Curated annotation (Swiss-Prot):
The protein's name: Elongation factor G
Gene3D superfamilies: 3.30.230.10, 3.30.70.240, Elongation Factor G (Translational Gtpase), domain 3, P-loop containing nucleotide triphosphate hydrolases, Translation factors
GO molecular function: GTP binding; GTPase activity; guanosine tetraphosphate binding; translation elongation factor activity
Coiled-coil residue windows: none
PANTHER family given in the database record: RIBOSOME-RELEASING FACTOR 2, MITOCHONDRIAL, TRANSLATION ELONGATION FACTOR G-RELATED
Key word Protein biosynthesis present: yes
Keywords linked to the UniProt accession: Cytoplasm, Elongation factor, GTP-binding, Nucleotide-binding, Protein biosynthesis
Its job: Catalyzes the GTP-dependent ribosomal translocation step during translation elongation. During this step, the ribosome changes from the pre-translocational (PRE) to the post-translocational (POST) state as the newly formed A-site-bound peptidyl-tRNA and P-site-bound deacylated tRNA move to the P and E sites, respectively. Catalyzes the coordinated movement of the two tRNA molecules, the mRNA and conformational changes in the ribosome.
Primary subcellular site in the record, as a coarse category: cytoplasm
Paired cysteines (S-S): none
NCBIfam families: EF-G, PRK12740.1-5, small_GTP
Length: 708
């Protein structure tokens, strides 16, 4: 089968935003104008096409990133038909992992901002993730028809809060109820969309006289920015003071792909104005798969050297599984992004992470929540494979003769845990299956059994995250569960360097046990990338080489269960530098025990402390409740980092607050502000716990030990 759409006409994009910026409505309009859905689905009435999980439609927020394919040839049919694969990403901070994994497989992104709310905390998180994966992006300032909409304020915030260089391609004609359309700064024409045809038709007119001066000022900035793309353009601009439309467009495209600028558009998706222009910008300025650097990976050779895969159908097949989902009708769906080569239905792929071959049953293309079966997928495609048995998010699938392992995604450790048990004993097995499936879909969700209490513990990125998973268990698997009080994921670490001896000697009739080590323990940054390091500086064979691994193992096992209060230990560098052994009695177990003993004693001598997760909290409140809310944050051991005035007499407070103090905050905040304040929270860092709080946690742990 030949390729239907040339690769240069592919756009793999994500539409990403803060919760209420109107991202789902924007995506709906995209699907409407590109002809996929003939009736526009509104979030208000729970009918949006992309929000296909029941809870999403109920809560009006997007949780999972559904992938959808559509086609666009421009507002005036001025382009050849382009294929746009859209990955819809959630905007709630508890689902940051979803954003992270979709960013990994995108070539470009559309950031949607609310013209009233502007750049919000989640927007900053998404921006950081886009920076991490170097995703070229454009921005769409939505809700221009809302009271308090201010295009120019949001442009300023993108500069100051996100550190981007926004270059408006349009400016709004009117605002709030009087928002009528936009001035296109490239062609210097005013565009008005026709309301009767839901924005399918539009008019081009002369720029309104009152906007002429502003349009010229912003046009000059646009041309100046474009001229910076190359030296030739800059010379031409300095000579003639102008560039042609084609020169501007190709320069803006180059600068966007190089992540130098953020082209900016605006409109109101709800009133069907401006999304059409955004689609044109996706085609004009965002990259095709071959415009971004070739994907890197580790080759399957002796040196595990680094290799790349060019975006070409001729290259060996390589793809990344970025999402696993359960479908009632077809079972397991593995969403993949194809980076190179071709995959046919019924053929086999190799998973180098699991070292397994798997046969591909069916390949389906998702159209929001309907599916179309495909015979093959090629470079640049995003589709779902049915029936993959042992693939997890982040795994590579490739050609067995040309193995490559693409860079894996980094998944954050959970910060909150709950005990969960089925309401009826009969549901125990069903609950285990349900939790296993949910954990396979979502790498930031973990399940384990507490060895002491025998309880099932689930861990995730926030209260809402776990609430929704418990809810899904009930809906999709028919398991009702009781949940316990939330538990915080504390950590233990040390502050000083110590040297410590550890000896394990057992003498019973016959062969005994003998292990003897000296360890140096040094603190490392508990927030760094490396949380534990083991070094060997043994001179003269005082501890034989074959036992070094056992010492390391003994230390790591002790670190898992903590010393101070039973929490995992992080930020320690352990050096084995001396010891002794016995020809007959020494074995691996003896040295494992000696390592564990030395570590435990050394840890307690190295000024140990507890760390707790600290959250970045942003509260937006009417000024009248400001004092109460600030006082409450202080009572919760919060540190206020800054404040900002928002339109309409609203204040924004930014603070860092320990997670342990944030349980039940939503209820408290609502009652203090009569339901008018809103807040968002995301994990910021691990920080040392004040002595009095730490002592309470440690004594609780010691009492539990005494009871047992």
């Amino acid at each position: 089968m030949a390729r239907k759409t040339p690769l240069k006409r592919y756009r793999n994009i994500g539409i990403s935003a803060h919760i209420d910026a109107g991202k789902t409505t924007t995506t709906e309009r995209v699907l409407f104008y590109t002809g996929v859905s003939h009736k526009i689905g509104e979030v208000h009435d729970g009918a949006a096409t992309m929000d296909w999980m029941e809870q999403e439609q109920e809560r009006g927020i997007t949780i999972t990133s559904a992938a959808t394919t559509c086609f666009w040839s421009g507002m005036a049919k001025q382009f050849d038909e382009h294929r746009i694969n859209i990955i819809d990403t959630p905007g709630h901070v508890d689902f940051t992992i979803e954003v992270e994994r979709s960013m990994r497989v995108l070539d470009g992104a559309c950031m949607v901002y609310c013209a009233v709310g502007g750049v919000q905390p989640q927007s900053e998180t998404v921006w950081r993730q886009a920076n991490k994966y170097k995703v070229p992006r454009l921005a769409f300032i939505n809700k221009m028809d809302r009271v308090g909409a201010d295009f120019y304020r949001v442009v300023e915030q993108i500069k100051t809060r996100l550190g981007g260089k926004p270059v408006p391609l349009v400016i709004p004609i009117g605002k709030e109820d009087d928002f009528e359309g936009v001035v296109d700064l490239v062609t210097m024409k005013a565009i008005y969309w026709d309301e009767a045809s839901q924005g399918m038709e539009y008019d081009e007119r002369e720029i309104p006289a009152e906007l002429q001066e502003k349009a010229e000022e912003y046009r000059e900035y646009l041309v100046e920015s474009a001229a910076e793309a190359t030296e030739e353009l800059m010379n031409e601009y300095l000579e003639n003071g102008e560039l042609t439309v084609d020169q501007i467009n190709s320069a803006i495209r180059q600068l966007t792909i190089d992540n130098e600028i953020i082209p900016l558009l605006c409109g109101t998706a709800f009133k069907n104005k401006g999304v059409q222009k955004m689609l044109d910008a996706v085609i004009q300025y965002l990259p095709a798969p071959m415009d971004v650097p070739a994907i890197k990976g580790i080759l399957d050779d002796k040196d595990e050297s680094e290799g790349t895969r060019e975006a070409s159908d001729e290259a060996p097949f390589s793809a990344l599984a970025f999402k696993i989902m359960n479908d009632k009708f077809v079972g397991n769906l593995t969403f993949v992004r194809v980076y190179s080569g071709v995959l046919k239905q019924g053929s086999s792929v190799y998973n180098p992470v699991k070292m397994k071959r798997e046969r591909v049953g069916r390949i389906v293309q998702m159209m929001a929540n309907s599916q179309e079966e495909l015979q093959e997928i090629r470079t640049g495609d995003i589709a779902a494979l049915v029936g993959m048995k042992d693939v997890t998010t982040g795994d590579t699938l490739c050609d067995e003769q040309n193995v490559i392992t693409l860079e894996r995604m980094e998944f954050p450790d959970p910060v909150i845990s709950l005990a969960v048990e089925p309401k009826t004993k009969a549901d125990q097995e069903k609950m285990s299956i349900a939790l296993g499936r949910l954990a396979k879909e979502d790498p930031s969700f973990r399940v384990h059994t507490d060895e002491e209490s025998g309880q099932t513990i689930i861990s995730g990125m926030g209260e809402l995250h776990l609430e929704i998973l418990v809810d899904r268990m009930k809906r999709e698997f028919g398991v009702e569960a009781n949940i316990g009080a939330p538990q915080v994921a504390y950590r233990e670490t040390i502050r000083n360097t110590v040297e410590q001896e550890g000896k394990f000697v057992r003498q019973t009739g016959g062969r005994g046990k003998f292990g003897h080590v000296w360890l140096r323990l040094e603190p490392m940054d508990p927030a760094g990338d490396v949380l534990y390091e083991f070094k060997e500086e043994v001179v003269g064979g005082t501890v034989p080489k074959e036992f070094h691994g056992a010492v390391d193992k003994g230390i790591q096992e002790r670190m898992k269960n903590g010393v101070l209060a039973g929490y995992p230990i992080v930020g320690v560098k352990a050096t084995l530098y001396d010891g002794s052994y016995h020809d007959v009695d020494s074995d691996e177990l003896s040295f494992k025990m000696a390592g564990s003993i030395a570590f435990r004693k050394g840890f307690m001598a190295a000024n140990p402390t507890l760390l707790e997760p600290v959250m970045k909290v942003e509260v937006e409140t009417p000024e009248d409740y400001m004092g109460d809310i600030m006082g409450d944050l202080n009572r919760r051991r919060g540190m206020v980092q800054g404040m900002e005035d928002l339109p309409g007499g609203t204040k924004q407070i930014r603070a860092e607050v320990p997670l342990a103090e944030m349980f039940g905050y939503a209820t408290q905040m609502r009652s203090m502000s009569q339901g008018r304040a809103t807040y968002s929270m995301e994990f910021q860092k691990y920080a040392e716990i004040p002595k009095s709080v730490a002592e309470a946690i440690i004594s609780k742990f010691n009492n539990k030990d005494d009871d047992e």
